[in-house]
Amino acid sequence: MSSKALFLDRDGVVNVEIGYLHRIEEVEFVSGIFSLCRTAMRLGYRLVIVTNQAGIARGYYDEAAFNALMAWMGEQLRSQGVELDAVYYCPYHPEHGIGDYKREHEDRKPGTGMLRRAMKELDVSLTQSVLIGDRCSDIAAANSAGLRQAFLLAGTEGSECSGNYLEVNALEEIEQWLLRDSSEVESDSGEVSGKVSPESF
């Protein structure tokens, strides 16, 4: 049976958006992210980061630096009881990329490539899954992939997005939605979701 995932954009959802984050000393986790992820894990969601990384394409930092930062962030999350199942990133940009990084790619949101990779590689049901983003491109990717629910965390995107989504001001609102949704599902089915034991990232 396929599992469900909580897809998280990184910059602006997991960490505070500062623009092309690549240094440990610049990382500030978004308020509520640890509690949200722990609750999602308890409700049976796999935790998957899906992030556009145009900073790699532009030459601001390389893939090794990105992976090193993600390893450190993974350790910080783990210290708070949070285990990531996977991190998918797109290092390409169709206009501002340098060399081989200047190209269109289905992984770059609003493309659905990263979501579909997770579906295949992690056996995730997209129609049972949820995405949290802070930009319209996140919402478009979620809608195109047929995700059950998309959330837009207010603060980064300056205009209203098209498509189906719920806009929230804090991650705590999404945590409460997940809890209510789980209660409704359990009431309908009479079954209780089990906790997933994700592998360490």
What label would you give each PLM region?
Residues S2-K4, A64-A86, E95-L131, R135-F201:
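Asp-based, Mg2+/Mn2+-dependent phosphohydrolase catalytic module
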Residues S2-R46:
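Active-site neighborhood of HAD-like aspartate-dependent phosphohydrolases
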Residues L8-R10, T51, G133-D134:
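Active-site flanking residues adjacent to catalytic metal/cofactor-binding acidic residues
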Residues V14-E17, P91-D100:
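Short, basic/glycine-rich phosphate-binding loops at helix/coil junctions
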Residues G19-E28, D62-A64, Y101-H105:
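Short glycine-enriched, charge-decorated loop/helix-capping segments at active-site entrances
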Residues G19-L21, A54-A57, P94-E95:
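A short, flexible beta-alpha/helix-coil linker loop
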Residues R46-N52, D85-C90, L152:
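Short beta-strand segments at enzyme active-site cores
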Residues Q53-F66:
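A short secondary-structure junction motif
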